Amino acid sequence: MPVSRLKLTFWSVVILCSGLAVAGRPDGGYHLLKKYDLDAAPGGKEYWDYITFDASSRRLYISHNTEVKVVNADTGAVVGSVPDLKRVHGIVVMDDLGRGFISDGGADEVVVFDLKTLKPTGHIKTGGNPDCIIYDPASKHIFTMNGKSNDASVIDPAALTVLATIPIGGRPEYAVPDGHGTIYDNVEDKNEVVAIDSMRNTVKSHWPIAPAEEATAIDLDAQHHRLFIGGRNKLLAIMNVDSGKVVQTFPIGAGVDTNIFEASTGMLFVATREGTLHVYHEISPDNFSVVEAVKTEFGARNMALDPKSHQLFLDTADFAPAAEPSTEQPHPQPTPVSGTFRLLVYGR
């Protein structure tokens, strides 16, 4: 449903821990709470991808071109970084092992680092361009979805070895485990979701996601067996994983990259590059309602959730206008401005 714009009864702006604290909205909707500057990327080229929130340390691990920035989630302070990478995508944090795992797509490897010192301690070769990286609690293995070689690498996080390579049959994107031995993965160029048996390391099902296309973002309501699939054709599809059927769809903004379902509240969040945060609520497994569409900032397509505070973390930067079209670049895009990378905190 459309959301009316209500005038704020007051604005107060204060500098707090180097972040911008913003007055709350009287209508109780999601709004910007704080904004933190995160410094320029090494080498000056701004690029970012996944954000990982670690509840035990209350740290954010933020991919930032050739480094992972580590940020205090409560203060916005940068506490360190994992440097000297090629092109970072995702981060898995395993507190029980004291290790973190980074998918470095530019090096075709996973970089292992110490959670205390943030120093790299190992390198594991994977398939080409490992993008999404997840931990599967059923198998206790790490999986990387490799966008160039169209397969998944299965890693033992204790032994730091590759156990298997799973052919996907297309370009794998974001994936999510159900905790019981199945991983659901978007296959972007095939317009389908595959179900991976994480105990046998095989693909067991292929499901079309129509009318959604070019899916990137994905998350799961594990209790009710519903997948939330974000398509780059500006469509959110909700799928029953027992049948592989799409049961509901919603229009969304351009450039979706993250879906998050919060099981404790039944809230579903969808972040898009155009600068819209879509918020939905689960009435029943086959009936989601639109709560609101929140204007964020252009480029804020990646997101993490703090389940304690229910706050959302997004990141973006300023953008320079796109260049004029040319033969080499017929569809130029706006480019991020070096030194403007920042963290946005949203909540109610």
How should these model regions be labeled?
Residues G19-R348:
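Predominantly soluble domains enriched in secretory-pathway, periplasmic, or organellar proteins
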